[in-house]
């Protein structure tokens, strides 16, 4: 993307200069300077700081497309007031081709958490006591970006403490749905009785993973839609569900026993990074069929056909909504929130990141940074974000750099 911009700027300057006639042949070169809508997949800049909390999150799907879908659904209800829902998972059935994907995501999530819990003993993690800043390295950095209480009196300097695995990877929680088809919403009075679990785990359960602790109803026949209301005429059968829970739990336990081997830090870091990529890829596939909702103003998330009705939003304009969330379509960053940290190029050096050189430092997701410091190779898609091609100037050379 940068090369394209440089070529465009250079040709524009040449054409506008007084020497354009003498070098007309240069501008007529067969150079493809067309700007594609799709950005270079290998180029990813350092993520920008979060926007103002008063602004709503952008819609992944354009509003015109959402209105068109709503009109089609309304017209279909008028034409067929009573109909059988045919497309899973809206009809209460599982998507057959995504059952294995759900098991893979669940397995990769367990391997990711297990690997990070072992790597954290070798790669220190630091967390600011007053804000959400996370740093991976022997010592906390000196970059003044703290926004917590009293940050003005400390010149925005962070106050570091020892971090945990939950600071490295963020799995937001949502309400667990026993029956996503007939009862897709949790009301306000049920907020203390319905358990909340990780959104990734809830997505796997709704896609076919059976867990004894969090049961879910499985159907063999689709449900009916009568004037927009979901009705189920199938008899409840608990026998098959119990067998599925027992077999799935047994397979997971056997898989964990087989993989309990002593591995080096480099091998463990590489496998943990692979588990992260496989989990994110699987979650993307599941989100194409299973709906996930997020609030447009706060981090609340819900997996299911609709968002819940619990009135606990405290973000912008929540008084106008009576505490209800402004639900919209979620993205992968809402389900698996990457915590971006500053990249430490040489962890064994012992030097601390300086605030005056922060524009030369790169960033990366905390999981990637932790695995890279553990010995795993840097993924190609994070080379530019980590700014590996940038040479750090010395502290006394900062004023000499343009």
Curated annotation (Swiss-Prot):
<protein>
    <recommendedName>
        <fullName>APO protein 3, mitochondrial</fullName>
    </recommendedName>
</protein>
<dbReference type="GO" id="GO:0003723">
    <property type="term" value="F:RNA binding"/>
</dbReference>
<feature type="compositionally biased region" description="Basic and acidic residues">
    <location>
        <begin position="48"/>
        <end position="58"/>
    </location>
</feature>
<feature type="domain" description="APO 1">
    <location>
        <begin position="127"/>
        <end position="213"/>
    </location>
</feature>
<dbReference type="GO" id="GO:0005739">
    <property type="term" value="C:mitochondrion"/>
</dbReference>
<feature type="region of interest" description="Disordered">
    <location>
        <begin position="37"/>
        <end position="59"/>
    </location>
</feature>
<keyword id="KW-0677">Repeat</keyword>
<keyword id="KW-0809">Transit peptide</keyword>
<feature type="domain" description="APO 2">
    <location>
        <begin position="294"/>
        <end position="380"/>
    </location>
</feature>
<keyword id="KW-0496">Mitochondrion</keyword>
<comment type="similarity">
    <text>Belongs to the APO family.</text>
</comment>
<dbReference type="Pfam" id="PF05634">
    <property type="entry name" value="APO_RNA-bind"/>
</dbReference>
<dbReference type="InterPro" id="IPR023342">
    <property type="entry name" value="APO_dom"/>
</dbReference>
<comment type="function">
    <text>May be involved in the stable assembly of several 4Fe-4S cluster-containing complexes of mitochondria.</text>
</comment>
<feature type="transit peptide" description="Mitochondrion">
    <location>
        <begin position="1"/>
        <end position="13"/>
    </location>
</feature>
């Amino acid at each position: 993307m940068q090369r394209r911009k440089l070529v465009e700027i250079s040709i524009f300057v040449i054409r506008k200069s007084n020497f354009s006639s003498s070098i007309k042949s240069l501008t007529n070169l067969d150079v493809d300077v067309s700007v594609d809508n799709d950005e270079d997949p290998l180029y990813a800049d350092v993520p920008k700081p979060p926007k103002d909390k008063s602004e709503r999150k952008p819609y992944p799907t354009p509003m015109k497309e959402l209105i068109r879908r709503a009109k089609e659904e309304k017209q279909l209800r008028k034409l067929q007031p009573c109909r059988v829902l045919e497309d899973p998972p809206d009809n209460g059935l599982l998507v057959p081709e995504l059952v294995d994907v759900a098991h893979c995501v669940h397995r990769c999530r367990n391997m990711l958490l297990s690997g990070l819990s072992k790597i954290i003993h070798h790669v220190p993690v630091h967390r600011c006591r007053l804000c959400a800043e996370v740093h991976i390295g022997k010592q906390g950095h000196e970059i003044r970006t703290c926004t917590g209480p009293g940050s003005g009196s400390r010149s925005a300097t962070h106050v570091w403490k020892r971090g945990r695995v939950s600071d490295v990877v963020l799995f937001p929680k949502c309400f667990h749905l026993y029956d996503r088809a007939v009862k897709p919403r949790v009301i306000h009075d049920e907020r203390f009785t319905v358990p909340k679990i990780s959104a990734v785990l809830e997505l796997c359960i709704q896609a076919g993973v059976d867990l004894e602790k969090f049961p879910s109803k499985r159907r063999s026949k689709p449900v009916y839609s009568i004037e927009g209301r979901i009705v189920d005429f199938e008899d409840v059968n608990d026998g098959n569900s119990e067998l599925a829970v027992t077999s799935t739990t047994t397979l997971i336990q056997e898989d964990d026993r087989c993989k309990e081997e002593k591995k080096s830090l480099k091998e463990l870091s590489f496998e943990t990074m692979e588990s992260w990529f496989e989990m994110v890829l699987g979650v993307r596939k599941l989100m194409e069929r299973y709906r996930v909702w997020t609030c447009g103003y706060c981090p609340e998330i819900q997996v299911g056909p609709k968002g819940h009705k619990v009135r606990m939003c405290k973000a912008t304009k929540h008084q106008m909504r009576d505490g209800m969330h402004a639900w919209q379509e979620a993205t992968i960053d809402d389900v698996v929130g990457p915590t971006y940290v500053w990249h430490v190029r040489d962890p064994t050096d012992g030097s601390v990141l300086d605030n005056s050189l922060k524009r030369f430092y790169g960033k990366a997701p905390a999981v990637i940074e932790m695995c890279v410091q553990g010995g795993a190779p840097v993924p190609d898609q994070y080379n530019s974000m980590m700014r590996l091609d940038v040479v750090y100037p010395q502290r006394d050379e900062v004023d000499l750099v343009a």
